[in-house]
């Protein structure tokens, strides 16, 4: 078992599409979402063998809230309940991603913790006990565990891999937190109620093949939607400002909100267009969090 410090990235999750199929009788929502992961991330380090603890640092540390409630510790305790004599340790979280932002920052951190704990205890990352701990930690943690592009269905626990190419993208967050529960409340589905558009989900076409181009994928993603965009606009109207700013960029191919917001993204045909678009946004909105990179 490793005795030296272990480190891993916690990449931002982006919902390229997000359909809310309906609300189940248990109150959870069934979803269908094409998920990709960005090249921006938090970084989590584990010092194995020390007493379980978490220290946050980095530019986003002040937004993490009470350390005792952090999903890194929740995931660790859930795995410890399933793995006798689990070797944990001291975690250090270098926080860069915005919180309550629709990009699964806390979930990605928890997934990174589970991957590090698996390495520290000679477990496979897809060990059923690790996967179960991920599911119980939070709805976005299972998809963040492998952090690979996929179609996510059910309550986020059924993952079908997708051959997604590298998509040049700009991500923007206005530094305004949006609570997921408030957005789903604004959506207003009753328990057992199907959402408008269920027929579209059931009849949806397959996604591009393994050798499809970036242009083919952008066309396919553009045909989709995010059913949480409209309720998120009711909760926090600044989401509309972000979407309008992205849609106005030169060379933009499409723009959409991720998750329950407020982070939005825009896809481009080239890295050059992506970088140019980000510079335009930084000049116009110096207070926003802006990342120029890619999704894959």
Curated annotation (Swiss-Prot):
User: Which chemical reaction does it catalyze?
Assistant: 4-CDP-2-C-methyl-D-erythritol + ATP = 4-CDP-2-C-methyl-D-erythritol 2-phosphate + ADP + H(+)
A single Gene Ontology MF term assigned here is: 4-(cytidine 5'-diphospho)-2-C-methyl-D-erythritol kinase activity
Q: Which GO terms describe its biological process?
A: isopentenyl diphosphate biosynthetic process, methylerythritol 4-phosphate pathway; terpenoid biosynthetic process
Q: Active site at which residues? A: 13, 140
Q: Which family does it belong to?
A: Belongs to the GHMP kinase family. IspE subfamily.
Q: Where does ATP bind?
A: 98-108
* EC number of the protein: 2.7.1.148
Please, which domain of life does this record's source organism belong to? Answer: Bacteria
Can you name this protein? Answer: 4-diphosphocytidyl-2-C-methyl-D-erythritol kinase
| Pathway it works in | Isoprenoid biosynthesis; isopentenyl diphosphate biosynthesis via DXP pathway; isopentenyl diphosphate from 1-deoxy-D-xylulose 5-phosphate: step 3/6
Q: What does this protein do?
A: Catalyzes the phosphorylation of the position 2 hydroxy group of 4-diphosphocytidyl-2C-methyl-D-erythritol.
Which keywords appear in this protein's UniProt record, sorted alphabetically? ATP-binding, Isoprene biosynthesis, Kinase, Nucleotide-binding, Transferase
């Amino acid at each position: 078992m490793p005795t030296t410090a272990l480190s891993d990235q916690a990449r931002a999750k982006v919902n390229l599409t997000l359909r809310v199929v309906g609300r189940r009788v248990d109150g959870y929502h069934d979803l269908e979402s094409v998920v990709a992961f960005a090249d921006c991330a938090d970084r989590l380090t584990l010092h194995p063998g020390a007493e379980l603890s978490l220290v946050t640092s980095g530019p986003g540390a002040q937004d993490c809230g009470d350390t005792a409630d952090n999903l890194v510790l929740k995931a660790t305790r859930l795995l410890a309940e399933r793995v006798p004599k689990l070797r944990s340790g001291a975690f250090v979280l270098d926080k860069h991603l915005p919180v309550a932002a629709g990009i699964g920052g806390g979930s990605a951190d928890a997934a990174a913790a589970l991957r590090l704990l698996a390495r520290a205890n000679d477990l496979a990352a897809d060990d059923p006990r690790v996967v179960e701990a991920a599911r119980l930690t939070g709805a976005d943690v299972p998809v963040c565990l492998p952090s690979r592009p996929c179609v996510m269905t059910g309550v986020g626990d059924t993952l079908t891999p997708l051959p997604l190419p590298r998509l040049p993208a700009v991500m923007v967050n206005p530094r305004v937190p949006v609570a997921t529960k408030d957005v789903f409340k604004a959506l207003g589905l009753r328990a057992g109620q199907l959402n408008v558009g269920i027929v579209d989900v059931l009849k949806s076409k397959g996604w591009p093949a393994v050798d499809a181009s970036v242009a083919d994928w952008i066309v396919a993603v553009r045909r989709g939607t995010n059913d949480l965009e409209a309720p998120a606009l009711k909760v926090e109207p600044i989401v509309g400002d972000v979407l309008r700013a992205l849609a106005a960029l030169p060379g933009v191919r499409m723009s959409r909100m991720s998750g329950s917001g407020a982070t939005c993204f825009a896809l481009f045909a080239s890295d050059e267009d992506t970088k140019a678009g980000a510079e335009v946004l930084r000049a116009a909105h110096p207070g926003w969090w802006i990342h120029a990179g890619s999704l894959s």
